[in-house]
Amino acid sequence: MGRWPGGTREKVQRAALELFADRGYGATTVDDIAARAGVSARTVFRHFRDKEEVLFGADDELGAVLRDAARSAPPDLSPLAVVHHALDALAVALGPDRDALRRRAAVLASDVALQGRDLTKQARWTALLAEELVARGAPRGTAELLAATGAAAFRATYTAWLTGAGDGGLQERLDTARAAQERAWTGPWRGGGGSRPGPRS
């Protein structure tokens, strides 16, 4: 959801997450959120279309971060490096507040409709990333493959970071995951010999 400065929008987001955790998403109204945040319902609606938008209001901004990072990546980077560069920028934009992100993830997990919207967002970001790779000259099939695999690895790492213990940041987790992925892709078969075993007789 991004960083948590002290503006009205951020106060509303904090209040909403607290209430969603305490009462459940379905049982929380905009009036409840406004009261917890210490603002009027009209103020909430000035910042968010509805209570669902409180959870997804940063999506366009985060998508723009992803797009702009891919677009501004150094021209000599490989397509895979561009994917990593863009996803690193997204990791920074998500911010360091793991507790707030955990609360948001728990709310999404509790509601099928919210999960569907989140999946739609992920697909949109993946397609956006693929289009930026195509614009840089990558073949479409390659661009779509790299964007999809990069996004899937990011989601898996992000989920592990949210649910895991320890003080490491998301970027540290991404670096570790990519190193492990590289070893898995380029290392020998089953750790020895460098060749795949033949069929059993």
Predicted regions and their residues:
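Amphipathic alpha-helical packing segments from all-alpha helical-bundle domains
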Residues: 112-136, 144-148
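Basic, helix-initiating cap at the start of DNA-binding domains
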Residues: 1-23, 27-39, 56, 65
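Residue-level detection of the helix-turn-helix DNA-binding "recognition helix"
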Residues: 35, 49-50
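Hydrophobic alpha-helical segments that form the core
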Residues: 108, 140-160, 173-184
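Alpha-helical DNA-contacting segments of helix-turn-helix folds
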Residues: 52-62
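Hydrophobic alpha-helical connector segments
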Residues: 64-106, 110
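Short hydrophobic/aromatic patch on the recognition helix
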Residues: 40-48
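C-terminal peripheral helix-coil segments that are non-catalytic and often amphipathic
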Residues: 166-201
